[in-house]
Amino acid sequence: MEELYKQLAALARQHGARRLVLFGSRARGDNRYNSDVDLAVYGMPEGNRANFWMDCEDLPTLLNFDIVHITDGMNPVFIENIKKDGVTLYAAED
């Protein structure tokens, strides 16, 4: 999984994300072998999002990706859960 996470981080950087966070069961460590990969993406330009998703889908894995682009006005409880359980895979240097 570590190699997959490195590839996801590289894609996030390539597509202009400010931050990529793994959340959900894989971040908590209570996942099953076939659990999807939940990703929260911060600050990615809208024009890059579809290509990011397609590039993730092209990675050599049978796992499914659930990609959420974080925007203003999202459910604060959802955002708090990401903050509580999330594992940062990539953060842009300021």
Short names for language-model regions:
Residues M1-R19, A27-Y33, Y42-D94:
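Catalytic core of pol beta-like nucleotidyltransferases
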